[in-house]
UniProtKB/Swiss-Prot annotation:
Residues 12-98 form the Acylphosphatase-like domain. PANTHER family: ACYLPHOSPHATASE. InterPro entries: Acylphosphatase, Acylphosphatase-like_dom, Acylphosphatase-like_dom_sf, Acylphosphatase_CS. Its EC number is 3.6.1.7. The gene is acyP. Belongs to the acylphosphatase family. Keywords: Hydrolase. This is Acylphosphatase. It holds the Pfam family Acylphosphatase. NCBIfam families: PRK14424.1 (NF010998). One of its GO terms (molecular function) is acylphosphatase activity.
Amino acid sequence: MSRNELDERIETYYVRVRGVVQGVGFRHATVREAHALKLRGWVANLEDGSVEAMIQGPGAQIDRMLAWLRHGPPAARVTEVTFEERLIERRFDRFQQQ
């Protein structure tokens, strides 16, 4: 594997964010942050009050996104962020709110 291939390696992570994360603009802010970091995937509310996301992109950018998700937008009160790498073939076209 060449250095460029290593630099461009695309990773995919499934993320759950718990706390006060619905009704505070969390998904909208997540989309903005993902676009700024040039990440792809999606973010959605869950019935239990948490938010889930699938994030895809270079590892360094995903690390930045995970760091941001630990606090989210100003009105959010994040209590827990869990994530795991997913080995999937699908490549997302953009980052969107579901």
